[in-house]
Amino acid sequence: MAAKKSQKVTPLMQQYNSIKLKYPDAMLLFRVGDFYETFGEDAVKAARILNIVLTNRNNGGERTELAGFPHHSLNTYLPKLVKAGQRVAICDQLEDPKMTKTIVKRGVTELVTPGVAMNDDILNSKSNNFLCAVHFGKKNLGVSFLDVSTGEFLCAQGNTEYIDKLLQNFGPSEILVQKKFKKEFNESFGKDKHCFYLDDWIFKIDYSEETLNAHFQTKSLKGFGIDHLEEGIIASGAVLYYLAETRHHRLQHINSINRIAEEQYVWMDRFTIRNLELYHSTAANAVTLLDVIDKTISPMGGRLLKRWLALPLKDAEMIEKRLQVVDFLIKNPEILANIQDQIREISDLERLISKVATQKISPREVNQLKNSLNAIIPVKELALKCNNEALKIIGDNLHSCDLLREKISESISEDAPVLIQRGGVIASGFSSELDELRGLAFSGKDYLDKMIQRETEKTGISSLKIGSNNVYGYYIEVRNTHKDKVPEEWTRKQTLVNAERYITEELKEYESKILGAEEKILHLEQELFGKLIAWMAEYIDPVQQNARLIARLDCLCSFAQQAQAENYSKPEITDSYGMDIEEGRHPVIEKQLPPGEVYVTNNLHLDREEQQIIMITGPNMSGKSAILRQTALIVLMAQMGSFVPARSAEIGLVDKIFTRVGASDNISMGESTFMVEMNETASILNNISDRSLVLLDEIGRGTSTYDGISIAWAISEYLHEHPAKPKTLFATHYHELNEMCETFERIKNFNVSVKELKDNVLFLRKLVPGGSEHSFGIHVAKMAGMPQMVLHRANKILAKLEASHSMEDSGAVLKKSAEDEMQLSFFNLDDPLLEDLKQELLGIDIDTLTPVEALMKLNEIKRMLGNNKQQ
């Protein structure tokens, strides 16, 4: 909103208001002298976000809020504004105030938004900063991702579920949406995204094709392999439109657009990505898989590893190539160490060369680019000497950029500053004109020393001094005791208490030369630096290629280092439908164990013929969920091309990983824990394939016991009878499901073993054949610190209930019900009170019960028994 107006608005505020009207959705940083000022509502927001002083100023009779900061602090305050979700329009002075007698011309030079930023203080070095656009088509949705700081440009299209998965994977900082689809977007993807809404006309195929072809200087998009993706093209066009609107016109580094090939990568929906905690966790300070396996050194390597984690491969040949490189590096630790030593010398090549394209690179960063390219030479030589085909290909394709490195070396000083205004950017010997000017400007001390010596000899004044100030410039200072010796041609300029200051024609001449030289030096350095940057733009493609190859090599070195350190093994990827893991471990839990504690490994076998579904029972806290997660993580790591935490692993290619793990709710969308659970499970059942891996944990826990058992049974039966026969791990504490193995031949029972001691339970965390009959919920309650009285009473009630129920086995009822079309019919008790108690206890979910709730429940049971005695 523009600042408050009145009939007597000052010319400065008139100018501010006219510019603000063009950017109503952005905070306007308005350059006034040495400060960036904000006014009105912008000032209120800025003061709150930046914790700076909010004041008022008189604006033609009105009071206007004002908050500002020094212009040189822009890089300190701008990131804070953008990270707070603000779109920031930077309005600069477009002319020198000294050169105009009227108000200084001003204009917006850049619009910085959460998704469009080049500032290093805004960006995370190991994460992409994606701007995204989503287009709602008639049949499909289109999506596009662009990181303006690296030049990566991607697009895809598909159903809502696929786009949702991509949004989860790529985590865009800002999403562009058509205004009329705001409601649909919120319903499909939630309200927690940072969105900006654009006019409908932007989302048209003709406009988008024209925009993309104009940008890439092509006549067709066939060469990029996206010509058939109409919705994806429309989304991509919207992204380029937004860049133009935000004053980002220098985009030479965005020289390609790639399709996200859905068929090349393992499918993981957003629930799976969340449940496996690949790179985010809902728990505070939780360790993710990325935290454990990321041993990358370079920023671009870190970003690529995150992409590999989000998009594991389905192509066995591509996986094997990665594994072979990792295997070679492990067997040749000296080569691994040498390559990593050189990668440490390489800065963020992708973002540095992007700054060349956008002309935002500093002199010091140009040297960083040169040093990074220098470090690539030994990497290239090492890779070419390796007895590994994939590494040789990397070596072949690394560009030495000889001319670029040479040009930077001869033109830029080794100790070049960050800001060109500080001078000393261009190396000596590069420009004879510059060297001559520097000789004049910086040989001043010698010249002045000679002048003092000469004038002292001529006048006989031994205490002569030459100095300068902003008012009088250069002067000769003579003490009062010697002023009678001053020559007549000297002109007195200033009288002090003990001295007089004079100027001479020679000194005036020298001063004009010095001042002119310094100004010319700055101008010439800026001109030469600008020409160098324009020339360097010719190397955008080869430097980007180097960045991609170094990132790839960095990831493979990271895999090798991790495998060495943690004793991982090379997985065998096959075309079979089975899975055989020997002594598998959970990579994250293993790293968090106390010193000296050994991780309990587990074997696991799945196939389509005999052991398609493993039903895992066992007490709470025994490690059922860990076994499920570690299986998924081992498969995922293997198909990334990494070694895995197991003694051995033979894995038939998996094309989809589904997980339903842990309880959560979605209150903001009006969904209960059970509704969320059913939504996620329905998504799994509707998308399974013959190469799917399905992991289900405690399905049905969010509803009543009978409902839960019925649903869990029916889901297991559905998966068993489905033609795809997906490999499934099903963890449950419904012991009734153990009976399924007698009816369904490919369901096998396993349990996570425990050892019962006199008054305690020891969790062995070992997966063994056979079902478990006990949940040991009361033992878990004891571990949680439940009062002894509650535990004692719970044991008594449990014993009575078990004795009462021994007359008829609930598992047998379930087995019979499966044969009788799932008509559940549980035992009847003659005593109505016992029936009431049974219903009360069966309705208790011990996993979610708090100590206070347990006490209240026991008090209710006691009241029921007391009432019965009185009757």
Curated annotation (Swiss-Prot):
Binding site for ATP: 618-625
PANTHER family in the cross-refs: DNA MISMATCH REPAIR PROTEIN MSH1, MITOCHONDRIAL, DNA MISMATCH REPAIR PROTEIN MUTS FAMILY MEMBER
GO molecular-function terms, A-Z: ATP binding; ATP-dependent DNA damage sensor activity; damaged DNA binding; mismatched DNA binding
Role summary: This protein is involved in the repair of mismatches in DNA. It is possible that it carries out the mismatch recognition step. This protein has a weak ATPase activity.
GO CC list: cytosol
Domain of life: Bacteria
Encoding gene per record: mutS
Protein keywords: ATP-binding, DNA damage, DNA repair, DNA-binding, Nucleotide-binding
Pfam family for this entry, one: MutS_III
Family: Belongs to the DNA mismatch repair MutS family.
Protein name: DNA mismatch repair protein MutS
Organism field: Christiangramia forsetii (strain DSM 17595 / CGMCC 1.15422 / KT0803) (Gramella forsetii)
InterPro entries, per the entry: DNA_mismatch_repair_MutS, DNA_mismatch_repair_MutS-lik_N, DNA_mismatch_repair_MutS/MSH, DNA_mismatch_repair_MutS_C, DNA_mismatch_repair_MutS_clamp, DNA_mismatch_repair_MutS_core, DNA_mismatch_repair_MutS_N, DNA_mismatch_repair_MutS_sf
GO BP of this protein: mismatch repair
